[in-house]
UniProtKB/Swiss-Prot annotation:
It comes from Drosophila melanogaster. PANTHER family: 40S RIBOSOMAL PROTEIN S26. Component of the 40S small ribosomal subunit. Residues 87-114 are annotated as: Disordered. This is Small ribosomal subunit protein eS26. One of its GO terms (molecular function) is mRNA binding. One of its GO terms (biological process) is cytoplasmic translation.
């Protein structure tokens, strides 16, 4: 039978069994090595309320805490929520992650700091 991927869609080489994790979206059990992982760093406070909180704060240079979360997706949820996309046979061999695009406001702020 033909094989679509050299790794069979997983990262389990020479391991018999890998513990499952639950998909963040649908709670399906997925082997940890097969799950699509995404590490998200967000502000605890939403962007609209940041200015209000900084103005009301007693301390001048108080840095708002961030929320760190590692999301695990099953393959179907990752495709549906566009975390990953299907690629051509040649493009599947490219292992480098795609370039990260940032919002224009962040790019402008970075230029002002330099």
């Amino acid at each position: 039978m033909t094989k679509k991927r050299r790794n069979g869609g997983r990262n389990k080489h020479n391991r018999g069994h890998v513990k499952p994790v639950r998909c963040t979206n649908c709670a399906r059990c997925v082997p940890k090595d097969k799950a699509i992982k995404k590490f998200v760093i967000r502000n605890i406070v939403e962007a609209a309320a940041v200015r209000d909180i900084t103005e009301a704060s007693i301390w001048d240079s108080y840095v708002l805490p961030k929320l760190y979360a590692k999301l695990h997706y099953c393959v179907s949820c990752a495709i549906h929520s566009k975390v990953v996309r299907n690629r051509s046979r040649e493009a599947r061999r490219i292992r480098t992650p795609p370039l990260r695009s940032f919002p224009k406001d962040m790019a402008r702020n970075n230029q002002n700091r330099k």
